């Protein structure tokens, strides 16, 4: 299977990891704030 545009796959991977990073930061912020205000 040949991929004529490997750059597009790299961009998609970076975008996906960026979304996962933001989601992780959001979850950690919620847990941290609930731990502080409890």
Swiss-Prot record:
Pfam families: PsbL (PF02419). It comes from the Eukaryota. Disulfide bonds: none annotated. Its main location: plastid. Keywords: Chloroplast, Membrane, Photosynthesis, Photosystem II, Plastid, Reaction center, Thylakoid, Transmembrane, Transmembrane helix. GO terms for biological process: photosynthesis. Belongs to the PsbL family. This is Photosystem II reaction center protein L. It comes from Ostreococcus tauri.
């Amino acid at each position: 299977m040949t991929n004529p545009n490997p750059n597009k796959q790299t961009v998609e991977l970076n975008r996906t990891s960026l979304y996962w990073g933001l989601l992780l930061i959001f979850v950690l912020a919620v847990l941290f704030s609930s731990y502080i205000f409890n």
